[in-house]
Amino acid sequence: MSSNKINKKSIARIAAVQAIYQNILQNNDDMDDIMQNVLSFYQNNNSTTALPENLKISLSISHFKMLVKSVFENINKLDEIIDNHLTNDKDPAHMPILLRALLRVSICELLFCPTTPAKVVINEYTDIANDMLNEHEIGFVNSILDKIAQENNKIS
């Protein structure tokens, strides 16, 4: 049997969204505590209980920590960017928590991680959104990331 592996950075992105979701949901600003909770979940293999036996999951700890720290350092700017891209009929206070968490992490990686190409960021987070959000929200994630990438000359 061949062993399947999921990209370590992809898992780190999912874990970062989970950490930021936990931050919002629990109103917990202790970044180290949040990171430790999420890391222990993955390191104790709790994430693999519902997966096929031959599927191996591990995350890039450095990428995970970099994403979470960058979100915490830039949270006000990220929220301002998100809120500025909402249409007039959308109230930022009513944005679903998971959607806001995913947007914070994805926009953070898009703007503050120059080593990751914009198209990779857009594709990765659209895929993550596809697994976590409804159809309308998936389209919104794709659209907002594309607009932000264009506005910041990340793609043409």
UniProtKB/Swiss-Prot annotation:
GO molecular function annotations of the record: RNA binding
SUPFAM superfamilies assigned to the protein according to its UniProt record, in alphabetical order: NusB-like
Gene Ontology process terms (BP): DNA-templated transcription termination; transcription antitermination
One family name in Pfam for this protein: NusB
tRNA-binding recorded as keyword: no
CC terms in the record's Gene Ontology section: cytosol
UniProt keywords, alphabetically: RNA-binding, Transcription, Transcription antitermination, Transcription regulation
CDD domains named in the record: Terminator_NusB (cd00619)
Highest taxon of source: Bacteria
InterPro entries: NusB-like_sf (IPR035926), NusB_fam (IPR011605), NusB_RsmB_TIM44 (IPR006027)
Family: Belongs to the NusB family.
Function: Involved in transcription antitermination. Required for transcription of ribosomal RNA (rRNA) genes. Binds specifically to the boxA antiterminator sequence of the ribosomal RNA (rrn) operons.
HAMAP family recorded: NusB
PANTHER family on file: ANTITERMINATION NUSB DOMAIN-CONTAINING PROTEIN, N UTILIZATION SUBSTANCE PROTEIN B-RELATED
Protein name per the record: Transcription antitermination protein NusB
Organism: Rickettsia felis (strain ATCC VR-1525 / URRWXCal2)
Gene (UniProt): nusB
